[in-house]
Amino acid sequence: MESQKKFARTFSFEFFPPNTPEGAEKLAQTAKQLAQLKPKFFSVTYGAGGSTRERTLRAVLDLRSAGYAAAPHISCVGSSRNDIRDILKEYQTHGIRHVVALRGDLPSGTAASGEFQYANELVAFIRSEFGSQFHIDVAAYPEYHPQARSAQDDLLSFKRKVEAGANSAITQYFYNTDCYFHFVDECEAMGLSLPIVPGIMPIGRFSQLARFSDACGAEIPRWIRKKLEGYGDDTASIRAFGLDVVTRLCDDLLAAGAPGLHFYTMNQAGLTTTIWQRLGL
């Protein structure tokens, strides 16, 4: 963890692009609430196969017009070089200089296509086309990507993204600090030096969390899963327990030298704000 201690702490919040006017209004209110915590930026996700391209752009521009720093996600699978070039030029026109570069997923039932296969190819393309004009975040997987052939293959995949020109990384969420510490140590052993910011998923609804975790390969430790299952439909108890677990997780990460936190907010301000207040940030 020594390499992470030298980086300034950054805090950020992630949104998904709304698909209704009501959702857009709700996101505006959520952003206004979370902006009071003075994050470095808000990020906005990008749907499978670029399915939310226009909505992601609109959400990012709305955040910018409200005076907030925004970083759009860009996924490359299913896209051509011209597609990516056009997207980045559009963001550049609007003064956006920070992107989160991902491989991404194709919509269910769709065959692989496009001119990119891996995220490192996207990072390399951005650098070749735009030089250092964009700050590039990439994804990191302390518990390893669910499609990785092995732990070593996944580490090498991350290394290629860094060597292609990534500035920093945001991890998939996790609830076991040891996996993050071990991942950072392995990155240090490979000579990688960049901020690796832990991704944090507040716990609000167990069914939703279980579904997300099964899909993305994030492990819910057995003791946490059993406690949450035991609460059944008792939402208040789930939230109270989740706040305790995630606050402790964040506290331990920051105490060990993590260079900030990136919250997956699900377009909700409440849980993230409460965790923030409990941490005394």
Each language-model region and where it sits:
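Short, acidic/polar
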Residues: 21-34, 56, 81-89, 150-160, ...
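Active-site pocket-lining/capping segments in soluble small-molecule metabolic enzymes
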Residues: 22, 114-141, 190-243, 248, ...
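Active-site mouth loops of central-metabolism enzymes
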Residues: 10-26, 48, 70-82, 135-153, ...
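Catalytic domains of carbohydrate-active enzymes, especially glycoside hydrolases
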Residues: 32-45, 163
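Catalytic beta/alpha-barrel core
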Residues: 41-52, 74-76, 100-102, 167-176, ...
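Active-site-adjacent beta->alpha loops and helix N-cap segments on the catalytic face
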Residues: 2, 22-25, 50-62, 80-87, ...
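Conserved, mostly hydrophobic/aromatic
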Residues: 14, 42, 91, 161, ...
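N-terminal amphipathic alpha-helix/helix-capping segment at the start of soluble metabolic enzymes
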Residues: 1-13, 20-21, 25, 225-226, ...
